[in-house]
């Protein structure tokens, strides 16, 4: 380990890949404390549909940045950066290693690249974007964004109108994408790279075969329904102060159940769309991870900036025991803890 930089571990992966289970098992072997990197786990009262660790699991392996917002409250990338930097520093002061675990790739990327200063809002540009959306739909506007800034577009659902609009607005106002602005400000020294301050070990856990993940996603969504997902969303629905323009309610699974409660979907259609939306989320997460090493290689040749893939099956497709997955992770991470 580089003695001039304190260690930090990233544990990333698509939804339903086993990230949380691995993180809690690693805690039994390494002096780590867990920080959640998930844009939905921040919300209180949203437990089943987010696959939030149970109270018993959280008591055994506490996660920071879980249950820190009401669903009516916004939570931005900038909020996450402030919270994550604070928790990382606190864990280091205690002599432990921060292990950041989750699937919100935009948060991980923002940590590595820093949060660049973006141009101020332009009402005329935003009005034109909204006019295009009204005429052609938000998926059309999202495609326009993907053509100029595929990295940012990959993490934004086409129906997430506010984020799509803002990202495209930044490009039209400045002539540069959000991705370009972040990289330029980092190169100029305006944003000090995360890896300049920390010794980072990055792991991505995933099945080798996408079909295996799709099967897990379907099984997990049915399990969530059996555990009371509809009732959980109903409690949110009946509050009266929540609506589908809020990021919390647009979360995968929640939006589909909300539409079911709003009589916009039949039950079977809600189930099918919930599974499809979750698979689409996993696809976006894979898109980020596939480009991760390319992006890292362009920025740094440091061993500590490289992504280590950890597959949950052998090359022959045989599932690895959980103990074997932990052993593989420890083989990569042990130098971090020395």
UniProtKB/Swiss-Prot annotation:
UniProt-annotated site: Interaction with substrate tRNA, residues: 104, 126
Binding site for ATP: 13-20
UniProt GO molecular function: ATP binding; tRNA dimethylallyltransferase activity
Substrates-to-products reaction catalysed: adenosine(37) in tRNA + dimethylallyl diphosphate = N(6)-dimethylallyladenosine(37) in tRNA + diphosphate
Keyword Repressor among record annotations: no
Keyword terms, alphabetized: ATP-binding, Magnesium, Nucleotide-binding, Transferase, tRNA processing
Segments of this protein annotated with the region Interaction with substrate tRNA: 38-41, 162-166
Highest taxon above the source species: Bacteria
Binding site for substrate: 15-20
GO BP field: tRNA modification
InterPro entries: Dimethylallyltransferase (IPR039657), IPT (IPR018022), P-loop_NTPase (IPR027417)
Cofactor: Mg(2+)
Listed EC numbers: 2.5.1.75
Signal peptide: none
PANTHER family cross-referenced by the UniProt entry: TRNA DIMETHYLALLYLTRANSFERASE
Subunit-level organization: Monomer.
Similarity remark: Belongs to the IPP transferase family.
UniProt protein name: tRNA dimethylallyltransferase
Encoding gene, per UniProt annotation: miaA
